[in-house]
C-alpha cells in the first residue's frame, strides 16, 4: 500500500510539474500575409502560449517587370539592409535571387534584449517602445486590422 501511495504521489507530482512547467513552443502558431505593390510579405510567428518567441518574415518581389536600373536600386537597398541586420547579434538576414524573384528573409528571436534592439533600430514597429515581449493575439489583431490576411 505504501509503495502504491508513493507511486501515486510521484505521478501526481510529475503531472503537476508538466502542467506548471510552461507551455510548449508552437512553430508557425500564426502566419500573416500581405500583397502590396508587387511584393508578397509573409510573417510567421512561433509562440509559447500568447508570447511570440520568434518572427520569420519573408518578402518576395517578382523582378520580371523591373528594369536593370530598378534592380540595381533594389540591390543597393539590400546591401544597406544587410549592413543594418549584420549589426544585430541574434537576427538573421538573407536575400537571394531565385527564379526571377528576389527573396528576402529575416528571422528575429523575440527575447527581451533582441526585441529591445530591433525596436530601438526602428526595424519592428510596436505601440510601446519599452516592450519586453510580444503578445501573439495582439500582434495578429494589429496586422489583421492593417489589411494582412491571417492563417
Predicted feature locations:
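Positively charged n-region of N-terminal signal peptides that target proteins for export
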Residues: 1-4, 8-9
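C-terminal motif of bacterial Sec signal peptides marking the signal peptidase cleavage site
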Residues: 15-19
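Subset-of-secretome marker
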Residues: 23-151
Amino acid at each position: 500500500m505504501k509503495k502504491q501511495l508513493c507511486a501515486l504521489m510521484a505521478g501526481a507530482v510529475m503531472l503537476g510539474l508538466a502542467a506548471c512547467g510552461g507551455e510548449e513552443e508552437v512553430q508557425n502558431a500564426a502566419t500573416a500575409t500581405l500583397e502590396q505593390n508587387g511584393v508578397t510579405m509573409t510573417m510567421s510567428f512561433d509562440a509559447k502560449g500568447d508570447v511570440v518567441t520568434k518572427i520569420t518574415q519573408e518578402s518576395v518581389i517578382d523582378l520580371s517587370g523591373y528594369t536593370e536600373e530598378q534592380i540595381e536600386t533594389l540591390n543597393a537597398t539590400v546591401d544597406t539592409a544587410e549592413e543594418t541586420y549584420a549589426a544585430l547579434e541574434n537576427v538573421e538576414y538573407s536575400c537571394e535571387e531565385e527564379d526571377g524573384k528576389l527573396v528576402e528573409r529575416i528571422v528575429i528571436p523575440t527575447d527581451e534584449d533582441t526585441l529591445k534592439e530591433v525596436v530601438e533600430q526602428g526595424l519592428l514597429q510596436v505601440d510601446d517602445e519599452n516592450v519586453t515581449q510580444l503578445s501573439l493575439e495582439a500582434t495578429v489583431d494589429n496586422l489583421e486590422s492593417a489589411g494582412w490576411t491571417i492563417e
